[in-house]
C-alpha cells in the first residue's frame, strides 16, 4: 500500500498495476482511459472496480449532476451542444468509458458555443499511478476580445511544431484541431474550487488529441484577479534581485505570463506524439510531472522566439526575460512557500517547475547562466545569460519529449527524482521566514457568485 488516496482500497501498487495492465491491448490504437472513473477494491480476496455512476459509487451526487445536465440540455445553445450534454448524461448513467470518449470527441468538435463547460472525472494528479481522476466542473463564456491572441497562436500551431528543438520522429506530422480561446469562468466546482487552474487543455486522451484535436482555454478573469492581487503586495520587492528585473517584470510580466499559459495549453500539451505501441500510462507516477514539464518547456522555449514579435504578440525581443526570471525565481525559490518545513515536493506542477529550474541551473553552471547571489544575508536568483538559458530549455524540452514519446520510465523517474523532488532545507527555511513577514497566503481561492 503506497498511496494515501482512496482510489485503491486495500490494494497494493503492484496489484493495481497488474490489474490494469491485464486489461490493456497493446495493439488497440483507441484505448479507453482505464480505471478513470472507479475505485479499485478487494472483495473476498478478489480485485474489483466500484464504478462512479448512477446506481454505483457516489450515485446520490451523480444523480444530482444528471438532474442539472438534463435541465441544461433543454436550454442548449445549439444542436452540437445538446448532443454533447446528452452523451455526457449517458456516460454518467452507464459509467462506460467508451461513451466518455464519444462525449469527449463531440465536446472537442463543438467550437461554436459561446457558453461552454468542463464536467466529469478529468485530471489524475491525485492518483500516484496517474489513472484515476477527480471530479471537476467549470461553466464559462468566451471572451471575444482576448481570444484574438490565442487564435493567432493556434493558427500558427504547425509552424511551432515544425520548428521546435524536438527530434523529428517525436513530432506530429500534421497538427490537428488545435482550438484555443480565452474564457471568463462563471462558476467553479469540484477539484477546480475554490482554487482553480488558470489554463485547461482537454481531453487528456492521447489518441483523441491526435485524431480529433483538443480545446485549450486560458481563464482570463482568474488570471486577471491573480495579477491584480500580486501588484503592490511586496512579494517581488522581497524576492527579485534588482531594479533591472523589477522593471522588466512591471513592464512585461502580466503579458508574458498570459502568453506562457496560452503556449503551454494551446500548443505544449497538444505537441509531439507517442511512438507506435507506447502505453500512454508508461511513465506511471511520473507521467503528470513529465507532461506538465513538457508543456511548460514548450511555452518557455517559444515565449522567447522572434516569431512572437513578428506575430505582434509581444512588443519587443526583451519581453520574454520577465517570464524567464519569474519562472526561475519561482521554481528555484519562491514556490517553496507552499511546502511545510522538512517536507519534499509532492505535487506534479511544483515538481515540474523545480525540475526545469534546477536542471537549467545545474546544466548552465559552468557558464554561470544562472546563479544564486547573496545580499544582506538574503538569497536571490540571478540570470546572467538569457540566450544560453533558452538554449538549455530547448535541450531539456527535446529530452522530455523523447521520454514521453518512448515511454522511457527509468529516464523519467531519474529526471523527476534528481531535480524535481528534493528541497534544500537551508534555502527553504530562509524563504519561509522572508515570506512570513509579508503576511500573504501561499494559495488564493475564489468565491462562487450567486446567480
Predicted feature residues:
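An active-site-proximal "capping" alpha-helix that borders the catalytic cofactor pocket
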Residues: 78, 288-305
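Post-HEXXH active-site segment of zinc metalloproteases
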Residues: 272-293
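Long, well-structured alpha-helical subdomains associated
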Residues: 300-403
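Short, glycine/acidic-rich hinge or "gate" loops at secondary-structure transitions
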Residues: 79-85, 100, 278-281, 308-324, ...
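Conserved helix-loop functional segments at active or binding sites
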Residues: 268-276, 304-308
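Extended, compositionally biased alpha-helical segments that mediate assembly or anchoring
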Residues: 382-451
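Short alpha-helix carrying the canonical HExxH Zn2+-binding catalytic motif
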Residues: 254-267
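Contiguous, non-catalytic segments that form substrate-binding/exosite surfaces or channel walls
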Residues: 1-247, 253
Amino acid at each position: 500500500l503506497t498511496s494515501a488516496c482512496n482510489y485503491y482500497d486495500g490494494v497494493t501498487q503492484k496489484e493495481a498495476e497488474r490489474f490494469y495492465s491485464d486489461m490493456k491491448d497493446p495493439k488497440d490504437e483507441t484505448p479507453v482511459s482505464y480505471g478513470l472513473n472507479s475505485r479499485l477494491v478487494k472483495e473476498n480476496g478478489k480485485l474489483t472496480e466500484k464504478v462512479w455512476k448512477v446506481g454505483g459509487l457516489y450515485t446520490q451526487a451523480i444523480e444530482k449532476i444528471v438532474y442539472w445536465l438534463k435541465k441544461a440540455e433543454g436550454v442548449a445553445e445549439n444542436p452540437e451542444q445538446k448532443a454533447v450534454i446528452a452523451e455526457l448524461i449517458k456516460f454518467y448513467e452507464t459509467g462506460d468509458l467508451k461513451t466518455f470518449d464519444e462525449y469527449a470527441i463531440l465536446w472537442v468538435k463543438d467550437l461554436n458555443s459561446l457558453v461552454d463547460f468542463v464536467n466529469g472525472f478529468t485530471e489524475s494528479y491525485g492518483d500516484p499511478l496517474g489513472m484515476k481522476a477527480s471530479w471537476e466542473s467549470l461553466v464559462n463564456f468566451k471572451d471575444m476580445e482576448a481570444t484574438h491572441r490565442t487564435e493567432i497562436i493556434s493558427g500558427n500551431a504547425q509552424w511551432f511544431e515544425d520548428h521546435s528543438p524536438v527530434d523529428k520522429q517525436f513530432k506530429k506530422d500534421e497538427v490537428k484541431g488545435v482550438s484555443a480561446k480565452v474564457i471568463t469562468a462563471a462558476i467553479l466546482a469540484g477539484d477546480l474550487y475554490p482554487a482553480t487552474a488558470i489554463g485547461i487543455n482537454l481531453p487528456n486522451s492521447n489518441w483523441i488529441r491526435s485524431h480529433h484535436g483538443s480545446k485549450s482555454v486560458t481563464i482570463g478573469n482568474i488570471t486577471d484577479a491573480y495579477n491584480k492581487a500580486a501588484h503592490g503586495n511586496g512579494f517581488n520587492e522581497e524576492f527579485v534581485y534588482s531594479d533591472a528585473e523589477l522593471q522588466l517584470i512591471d513592464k512585461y510580466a502580466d503579458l508574458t505570463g498570459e502568453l506562457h499559459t496560452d503556449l503551454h495549453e494551446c500548443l505544449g500539451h497538444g505537441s509531439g506524439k507517442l511512438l507506435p505501441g507506447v502505453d500512454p500510462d508508461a511513465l506511471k507516477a511520473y507521467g503528470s510531472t513529465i507532461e506538465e514539464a513538457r508543456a511548460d518547456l514548450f511555452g518557455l522555449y517559444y515565449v522567447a522566439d522572434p516569431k512572437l514579435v513578428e506575430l505582434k504578440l509581444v512588443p519587443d525581443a526583451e519581453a520574454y526575460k520577465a517570464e524567464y526570471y519569474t519562472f526561475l525565481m519561482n521554481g528555484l525559490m519562491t514556490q517553496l512557500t507552499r511546502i511545510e518545513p522538512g517536507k519534499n515536493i509532492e505535487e506534479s506542477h511544483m515538481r515540474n517547475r523545480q525540475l526545469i529550474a534546477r536542471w537549467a541551473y545545474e546544466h548552465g553552471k559552468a557558464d554561470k547562466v544562472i546563479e544564486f547571489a547573496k545580499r544582506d544575508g538574503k538569497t536571490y536568483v540571478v540570470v546572467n545569460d538569457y540566450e544560453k538559458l533558452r538554449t538549455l530549455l530547448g535541450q531539456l524540452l527535446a529530452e522530455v519529449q523523447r521520454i514521453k514519446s518512448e515511454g522511457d520510465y527509468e529516464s523519467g523517474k531519474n529526471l523527476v527524482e534528481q531535480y524535481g523532488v528534493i528541497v534544500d532545507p537551508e534555502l527553504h527555511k530562509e524563504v519561509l521566514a522572508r515570506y512570513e513577514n509579508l503576511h500573504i497566503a501561499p494559495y488564493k481561492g475564489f468565491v462562487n457568485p450567486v446567480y
